[in-house]
């Protein structure tokens, strides 16, 4: 949901054309997150300011438009921007916007500027909750707004505080100015700011919205971390001016040590990571982004910012400052990590869509989730990220699983096996509802958070809620370095690989497997459950090959969509036991990708109202794979066929009990252990949703109104 990308080159000659191309490529890698408009800002040319004695400044070129990145790319071509100018130090920023404040219109697109000259330029993800009060205050100070967005308030706050400082005879550095602005913001943000007052500099900061910095150098960095500079370590500790002040009139009121007009505050130290062997400046490129996918083509060396971090880049250095004071136990460094991601993983290859590619990657992603974690010969599960916490989790009073969307369905799908193997009560919560109810959480609870991105806003807020109450927290995520993976006590990385399509497919099956492995690891030492334990592990061993068998149904499913489902307006999915979660997940896929109304129904509730919808015209998909509830599912199918319904039945291969003269058709899948059957049953539904969308001419990877990473509430 929205995407930020910034590019900084220092002592690396780049033409303006190359810089623009880097920004556009970065935005293209962010498209999958969902957006409705895009824009970039780069340096223009030296311009004289007649209102300031013809003082020269570097103006900025801001180009933005509604629609796709390819529309922005064409607009840049149409505007015939001079691409030949060479820069050895330059900051360019770019953004894809998903509308929250203000409609998708050009004036609401990012980047936003502080004033007509563009003294400060900002791109921002998140929601500023006090923007109405800020806007009212800034209007009272004479600022003129061009958009309806909350982000424009941030840009104007930068100019407002800059002018106050200059009026007081102080020239603050960009980091200190950023702190003053952040002091006034409420809500969530990930933002970048550049200014012609600070050429070649950029500040990036985050609170509740992801931001990382990629580092590319020819020489090896001296250390693989960057020191965090806390307030007590810094030479200048400004007393933050409040927006309700009438305006500071002296440096003392602003809390600064006075410096000569026009002279920047002294910078007395250099980051250890960027010291060169010969003490000469090191050529370096920085890539600031909200997503690793946009950085991996340039570098695999990345630093993930924490909430309240300020990344200040200038003179080829990256400095990390804190917008808040140091608390006990807080880390004093930010590690520079190596991304475990390859460029080909975020390319479509021979497939038409990312979703299709990711559906067919599931044999590999399922295997990768288990690789190195299950000893199939001795039937032992070892999850390194949980190993030291298992004894604590086994003693907990209850397990609370908290997630959103598809991740919520993976929790529902595995709740029963958790309860069976651990004999610990398990509840499954939607993160937003959990927060709305302010559900009681205790110190002896274990709260399990599941998220593909690890940045889902509702889940992160629920995580913070549980941490405040002293609960043990576990993260099940697909993104190393994400907020959730850093804030939880322990967890499991599902190793599904990058998932670009908005509709989650391989992440669902990998989450499902990871949760089953979690349940197995909790019962590793149980003698009474040894037989069940071994049965499930042997079943997991066969899952990748069985998924390959299910994928062979694609042509049959494609024909089924063409002949029976394309023109339908609604669809019911019936499931019971382990397959109720599969029905819900299938219904969600069909809704979000094909725009067809679909509903997952618990088969046991059929006679409590749902039967009123059944007739010969309503398409129904029923799950009738073999488990302990099979007779009850067959009873539900009989109730449907008795009312002229002709369901599509997903059953096990060679199951002769289902009469073909009563049902519309059958989709046969291999038989596996009851608690794993949902891994195979969900794949026909993924294919149905995909082919329905393709047949309707829908952009499968970018369904309307949806975003991959939901980073706002």
UniProtKB/Swiss-Prot annotation:
Name of the protein in its database record: Glutamine--fructose-6-phosphate aminotransferase [isomerizing]
Top EC class, one word: transferase
Lineage: Eukaryota, Fungi, Dikarya, Ascomycota, Saccharomycotina
Listed NCBIfam families: PRK00331.1
Pathway: Nucleotide-sugar biosynthesis; UDP-N-acetyl-alpha-D-glucosamine biosynthesis; alpha-D-glucosamine 6-phosphate from D-fructose 6-phosphate: step 1/1
EC number: 2.6.1.16
Database matches in InterPro entries: GATase_2_dom, GFAT_N, GlmS/AgaS_SIS, GlmS/FrlB_SIS, Ntn_hydrolases_N, SIS_dom, SIS_dom_sf
Function: Involved in amino sugar synthesis (formation of chitin, supplies the amino sugars of asparagine-linked oligosaccharides of glycoproteins).
Assembly, per entry: Homotetramer.
Annotated Glutamine amidotransferase type-2 domain residues: 2-316
GO BP of this protein: chitin biosynthetic process; fructose 6-phosphate metabolic process; glucosamine biosynthetic process; hyphal growth; protein N-linked glycosylation; UDP-N-acetylglucosamine biosynthetic process; UDP-N-acetylglucosamine metabolic process
Catalyzed reactions per annotation: D-fructose 6-phosphate + L-glutamine = D-glucosamine 6-phosphate + L-glutamate
Keywords, sorted A to Z: Aminotransferase, Glutamine amidotransferase, Repeat, Transferase
Originating organism: Candida albicans (strain SC5314 / ATCC MYA-2876) (Yeast)
Cysteine pairings via disulfide bonds: none
GO molecular function, one term: carbohydrate derivative binding
Pfam family, one: SIS
Gene label: GFA1
Domain SIS: 389-528, 561-703
Active-site residue numbers: 2
